[in-house]
């Protein structure tokens, strides 16, 4: 009985803490920046500011995040909240993960020298793991310890979604290997929804990440929200916005 009471308290604290964390600040700040500033400025003055790039025809912008020296965000030019949106599994929706990977050069331009692909990670958080309600993929540095674990387990990552050995940052992750050719043709969101039964109707429970491996392939990572173990499904935990991996 005592264990059940303690468990209930833990869940209550986790939920309350997550709710308060989500409510702090303006959750629509990024949406206002994209729709009311970047897009308007590009259309009226051919100037993407305050974004670094605006691609209206392709449906996305690239924006320099204030957190970290090299972190950028890729965001749509129209309303999509996040991983929970059914738009992400529709074939006409842009392949945002691939577009984000193609936008990684902004990190090198900002740094003034090349940022190796092996040092870069893309992440998107779940609704309980984010502070903003406009879809955004984080383009930033990979944590050095995560890079080491991905390298050490490269041979165990298959073309199916399987548990990553030992998890990452204290949380369970599923991993799947994809080639560049696969990634160009099909969005990771569609791969997760179509290949993982528990994700199909509950995409909003998941956060995702992507990094390149030494053989040129990519590893997709997905973690599912589990408040019992204080996992808000925030794949951004795999990134280091201070970029120690470059030191």
From Swiss-Prot:
A GO cellular-component term linked to this record: plasma membrane
Main location: membrane
Keywords on record: Cell inner membrane, Cell membrane, Hydrolase, Lipid biosynthesis, Lipid metabolism, Membrane, Phospholipid biosynthesis, Phospholipid metabolism, Transmembrane, Transmembrane helix
Intracellular or extracellular location(s): Cell inner membrane
Enzyme class: hydrolase
GO molecular function, one term: CDP-diacylglycerol diphosphatase activity
Domain of life: Bacteria
EC number(s) reported in the record: 3.6.1.26
UniProt cross-references to InterPro entries, sorted A to Z: CDP-diacylglyc_Pase (IPR003763), CDP-diacylglyc_Pase_proteobac (IPR015993), HIT-like_sf (IPR036265)
Membrane spanning stretches: 5-22
Pathway the protein takes part in: Phospholipid metabolism; CDP-diacylglycerol degradation; phosphatidate from CDP-diacylglycerol: step 1/1
Protein known as: CDP-diacylglycerol pyrophosphatase
Species, as recorded: Enterobacter sp. (strain 638)
Gene name of the encoded protein: cdh
């Amino acid at each position: 009985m005592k264990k059940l009471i303690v468990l209930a308290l833990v869940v209550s604290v986790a939920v309350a803490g997550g709710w308060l964390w989500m409510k702090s600040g303006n959750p629509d700040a990024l949406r206002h920046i994209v729709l009311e500033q970047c897009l308007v400025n590009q259309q009226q003055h051919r100037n993407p500011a305050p974004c670094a790039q605006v691609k209206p025809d392709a449906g996305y912008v690239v924006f320099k995040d204030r957190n970290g020296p090299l972190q950028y965000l890729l965001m749509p030019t129209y309303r999509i909240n996040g991983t929970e949106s059914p738009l992400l599994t529709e074939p006409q929706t842009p392949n945002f993960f691939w577009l984000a990977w193609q936008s990684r050069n902004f990190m090198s331009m900002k740094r003034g020298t090349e940022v190796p692909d092996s040092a870069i990670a893309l992440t998107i958080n779940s609704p309980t793991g984010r502070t903003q309600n406009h879809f955004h993929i984080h383009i930033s540095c990979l944590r050095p310890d995560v890079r080491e674990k991905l390298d050490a387990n490269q041979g165990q990552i298959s073309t199916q979604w399987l548990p990553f050995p030992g998890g990452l940052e204290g949380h369970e992750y599923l991993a799947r290997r994809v080639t560049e050719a696969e990634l160009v043709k099909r969005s990771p969101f569609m791969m997760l929804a179509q290949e993982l039964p528990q994700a199909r109707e509950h995409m909003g429970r998941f956060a995702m990440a992507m990094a390149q491996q030494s053989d040129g392939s990519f590893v997709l990572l997905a973690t599912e929200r589990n408040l019992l173990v204080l996992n808000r499904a925030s794949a951004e935990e795999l990134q280091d916005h201070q970029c120690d991996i470059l030191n």
